[in-house]
Amino acid sequence: SHGKQETDEEFDARWVTYFNKSDI
C-alpha cells in the first residue's frame, strides 16, 4: 500500500503529459 499522494502525483503528471502531447 502506497498512498493517494503518489497516485495523485503520477496521475497529474500523466494528465499534463497527455494534454501537452494532445495540444491542438
From Swiss-Prot:
Subunit and partners: Component of the cytochrome c oxidase (complex IV, CIV), a multisubunit enzyme composed of 14 subunits. The complex is composed of a catalytic core of 3 subunits MT-CO1, MT-CO2 and MT-CO3, encoded in the mitochondrial DNA, and 11 supernumerary subunits COX4I, COX5A, COX5B, COX6A, COX6B, COX6C, COX7A, COX7B, COX7C, COX8 and NDUFA4, which are encoded in the nuclear genome.
Gene source species: Thunnus obesus
Metabolic or biological pathway: Energy metabolism; oxidative phosphorylation
Cellular component terms (Gene Ontology): mitochondrial inner membrane; respiratory chain complex IV
Gene Ontology biological process: mitochondrial electron transport, cytochrome c to oxygen
Protein family: Belongs to the cytochrome c oxidase subunit 5A family.
Name of protein: Cytochrome c oxidase subunit 5A-2, mitochondrial
InterPro entries found in the cross-reference section: Cyt_c_oxidase_su5A/6_sf (IPR036545)
Primary localization: mitochondrion
Gene Ontology MF annotations: metal ion binding
Entry's localization field: Mitochondrion inner membrane
Keywords: Heme, Iron, Membrane, Metal-binding, Mitochondrion, Mitochondrion inner membrane
Superkingdom of the source species: Eukaryota
Membrane topology field: Peripheral membrane protein
